[in-house]
């Protein structure tokens, strides 16, 4: 076991691929777990929904619970008009959730602990919301940069402030997710290392404490996917509903 709790976030190359110009596109452990997450989501949806029944199987029940959650979140934040974007929000939620949970498993790797991954997901949300905003509202979408009732003399400053806040959305989304995943996994690693070094691994108290921490980390993994999804729906509301 590595003594450094941050080594679990180290990206390592599984096999090399030809570079594209100056860009390295080697297949890494991060690539593996993103592919694995996508595969598990696709397989679960296929198997769970292949034979829908009145009395759902456990996998179908989980998928339906997630789907109902996405629908209710969109309806409460965006309205009925936002239901056309259920596939987008469902994909984002399930991908983040599965990536978070895979990182908790032994020998797992938490891809959402890397800002490059979380920023890429956040940029997908940012670009999609911006496109949807202009699709629904046209140039009226730019009114988001100027709150209603703003005095004319204050308008230029408010536009700059709101533009900065709008462009900062993907940054705040990505940092929030990555920081929380790093913090949770690091704490578990530190405490587990302390328990092993003190040779008290087989005593009940530290084992129970680690189990509680892992349970808490599962809760955090679900919570962070939930927060990311809710914020995505809030941003969708700005794009779909006129101000």
Curated annotation (Swiss-Prot):
It is a multi-pass membrane protein. GO terms for molecular function: proton-transporting ATP synthase activity, rotational mechanism. PROSITE patterns: ATPASE_A. The chain crosses the membrane at residues 29-49, 54-74, 89-109, 114-134, 141-161, 177-197, 200-220, 221-241. The keyword Zinc-finger does not apply. One of its GO terms (cellular component) is proton-transporting ATP synthase complex. Keywords: ATP synthesis, Cell inner membrane, Cell membrane, CF(0), Hydrogen ion transport, Ion transport, Membrane, Transmembrane, Transmembrane helix, Transport. InterPro entries: ATP_synth_F0_asu, ATP_synth_F0_asu_AS, ATP_synth_F0_asu_bact/mt, F0_ATP_A_sf. It comes from the Bacteria. Pfam families: ATP-synt_A. The keyword Transport applies. It is found in: Cell inner membrane. Belongs to the ATPase A chain family. F-type ATPases have 2 components, CF(1) - the catalytic core - and CF(0) - the membrane proton channel. CF(1) has five subunits: alpha(3), beta(3), gamma(1), delta(1), epsilon(1). CF(0) has three main subunits: a(1), b(2) and c(9-12). The alpha and beta chains form an alternating ring which encloses part of the gamma chain. CF(1) is attached to CF(0) by a central stalk formed by the gamma and epsilon chains, while a peripheral stalk is formed by the delta and b chains. Key component of the proton channel; it plays a direct role in the translocation of protons across the membrane. This is ATP synthase subunit a. It comes from Ehrlichia ruminantium (strain Gardel).
């Amino acid at each position: 076991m590595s003594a450094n709790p941050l080594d679990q976030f180290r990206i390592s190359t599984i096999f090399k691929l030809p570079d594209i110009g100056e860009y390295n596109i080697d297949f890494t452990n991060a690539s593996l777990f993103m592919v694995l997450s996508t595969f598990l989501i696709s397989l679960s949806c296929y198997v769970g929904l292949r034979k829908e029944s009145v009395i759902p199987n456990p996998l179908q029940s989980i998928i339906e619970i997630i789907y109902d959650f996405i629908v209710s979140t969109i309806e409460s934040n965006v309205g009925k008009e936002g239901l056309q974007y259920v596939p987008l929000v469902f994909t984002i939620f399930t991908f983040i959730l599965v990536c978070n949970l895979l990182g908790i498993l032994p020998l797992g790797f938490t891809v959402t602990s890397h800002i490059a991954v979380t920023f890429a997901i956040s940029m997908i949300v940012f670009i999609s919301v911006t496109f949807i905003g202009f699709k629904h509202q046209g140039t009226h979408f730019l009114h988001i940069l100027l709150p209603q009732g703003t005095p004319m003399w204050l308008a230029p400053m408010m536009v700059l402030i709101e533009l900065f806040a709008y462009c900062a959305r993907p940054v705040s989304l990505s940092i929030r997710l990555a920081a929380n995943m790093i913090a949770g996994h690091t704490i578990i690693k530190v405490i587990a290392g302390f328990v092993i070094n003190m040779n008290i691994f087989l005593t009940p108290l530290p084992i129970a404490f680690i189990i509680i921490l892992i349970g808490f980390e599962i809760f955090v993994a679900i919570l962070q996917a939930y927060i990311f999804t809710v914020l995505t729906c809030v941003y969708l509301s700005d794009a779909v509903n006129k101000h």
